[in-house]
């Protein structure tokens, strides 16, 4: 009896040990699989966003050879941004032609309504003034006393002047809403050189990292510069909040790390405003909107320099820079653009059309001697010429989608 019990106990113990070994083996395999998956994902991500050493070398050799062959005006270097594929460090997605036409139709309708309303108010005001003039003239005519007539005329003249001043003040306020730079401070477009990139007229160059958020950085950079120009106050806006929260007027996301469009940013800032970097620091990846509360940093008005969002003429671009400050725009980035160090970027790469662009940038000035725009990029101050690049007029579709904004006070 005792021997039979021992036999059963041994059998049970054996089964239990086998079960433990099986579970342990499964756990080890699971752990091993997880690590392998992580390593595999890392390699895939690295392959997706980066160039291999051989690819970098080959790309640089090709760029240098092309520069020498075509005798270009700019120099290049092996910088940090050359390590990444272009698609991972750009990311602008222009609206379709249908979308632009729809937006333009909406804008025209609103402008026509506003025009008719303003004209109606103007006619009513003229009618009121004419009736007032006739009434006072009748009163004056009834007065027999010459001194009284003179006094009444003097009072009438003073009232007229006050009314004129009031109308002029109203016009000045309306004009301020239609421009960001006061007319007496705006640079002349006849200047051969001008740029909003001084210590008192521009904010620091930011770095978007390996995230296609150039559209968000451009939206923030344009607002920061123009707010500084208008109010004399330096801002550091949150690109992360723009990345996570911005939607256009139709409720569509302005973009993500896979690309976007700054038009949606300005739509959002018209309604909600913008948060500061301190409130929502940049993480370099798309997240969840942490706050939708309205802020004081709003856009009063914005629009494209050309109604069809096409590439403006140099004169049109200068006028916008003079009137509004920094301008949001786009360009086609190539390996040569990535490797830019100094000089005037005059690649004139092959393009399929005016909207063949992939990167949002900020245009802050011009130089007619260089025949180029001064562009503020979002790849950090160590890239290019301290974060800036001179791009020759017309090169690589520079200026497509150029847009201006008027910021709050």
Language-model features, listed with the residues they occupy:
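Bacterial N-terminal signal peptides that target proteins for export
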Residues: 3-15
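Sec/Tat signal peptide C-region and signal peptidase I cleavage site
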Residues: 26-30
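Bacterial N-terminal signal peptides
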Residues: 13-24
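Catalytic-core signature of thiol
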Residues: 31-409
């Amino acid at each position: 009896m005792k021997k039979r019990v021992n036999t059963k106990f041994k059998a049970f113990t054996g089964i239990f040990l086998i079960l433990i070994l099986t579970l342990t083996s499964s756990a080890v395999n699971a752990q091993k699989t997880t690590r392998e998956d992580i390593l595999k994902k890392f390699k895939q991500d690295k392959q997706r966003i980066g160039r291999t050493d051989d690819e970098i070398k080959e790309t640089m050799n090709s760029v240098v050879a092309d520069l020498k062959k075509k005798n270009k005006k700019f120099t290049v270097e092996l910088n940090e941004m050359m390590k990444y594929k272009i698609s991972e460090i750009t990311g602008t997605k222009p609206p379709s032609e249908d979308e632009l036409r729809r937006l333009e139709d909406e804008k025209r309708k609103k402008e026509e309504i506003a025009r008719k309303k303003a004209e109606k108010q103007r006619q009513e005001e003229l009618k009121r003034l004419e009736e007032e003039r006739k009434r006072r003239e009748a009163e004056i005519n009834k007065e027999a006393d010459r001194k009284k007539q003179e006094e009444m005329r003097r009072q009438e003249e003073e009232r007229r002047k006050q009314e004129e001043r009031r109308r002029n003040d109203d016009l000045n306020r309306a004009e301020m809403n239609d421009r960001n730079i006061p007319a007496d401070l705006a640079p002349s477009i006849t200047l051969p050189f001008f740029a909003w990139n001084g210590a008192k007229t521009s904010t620091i160059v930011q770095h978007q990292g390996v995230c296609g958020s150039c559209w968000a950085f451009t939206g923030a950079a344009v607002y920061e510069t123009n707010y500084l120009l208008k109010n004399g106050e330096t801002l550091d806006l949150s690109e992360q909040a723009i990345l996570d929260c911005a939607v256009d007027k139709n409720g569509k996301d302005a973009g993500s790390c896979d690309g976007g469009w700054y038009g949606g940013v300005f739509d959002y800032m018209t309604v909600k405003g913008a948060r500061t970097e301190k409130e929502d620091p940049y993480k370099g990846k798309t997240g969840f909107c942490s706050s939708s509360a309205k802020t004081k940093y709003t856009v009063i008005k914005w629009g494209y320099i050309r109604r069809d969002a096409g590439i403006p003429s140099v004169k049109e671009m200068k006028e916008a820079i003079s009137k509004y400050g920094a301008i949001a725009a786009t360009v086609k980035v190539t390996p040569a653009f990535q490797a830019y160090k100094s000089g005037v970027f005059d690649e004139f790469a092959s393009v399929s059309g005016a909207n063949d662009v992939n990167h949002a940038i900020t245009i802050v000035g011009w130089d007619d001697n260089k025949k180029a725009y001064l562009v503020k990029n979002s790849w950090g101050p160590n890239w290019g010429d301290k974060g800036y690049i001179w791009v020759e007029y017309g090169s690589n579709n520079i200026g497509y989608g150029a847009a201006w904004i008027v910021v709050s006070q």
